[in-house]
Swiss-Prot record:
GO CC terms: chloroplast
Name the record gives this protein: Uncharacterized protein ycf18
Keyword hit for Chloroplast: yes
Subcellular location as annotated: Plastid, Chloroplast
Chief localisation class: plastid
Stated family: Belongs to the ycf18/nblA family.
Key word Chloroplast present: yes
Keywords for this protein: Chloroplast, Plastid
Length: 59
């Protein structure tokens, strides 16, 4: 496994907390949280792309 595919200890802890948060949710609440999480991940991707595009390291 590549090191970039591994989670840090902090990320592992965050994952455990997230699992605890979703455990009591019903199906509708779980679906809503999943949609919110996906939206957040897509926004994060956009921010990363923007930073890379506008950095001094882009070619």
């Amino acid at each position: 496994m590549n090191i970039s595919n591994q989670l840090s200890l902090e990320q592992e802890f965050e994952l455990v907390l997230y699992k605890q948060k979703i455990e009591p949710l019903n199906l509708e609440q779980s679906r809503n949280l999943l949609a919110e999480t996906l939206r957040t991940m897509l926004l994060k991707d956009n921010i990363i792309k923007y930073v890379i595009k506008n950095s001094h390291f882009s070619q």
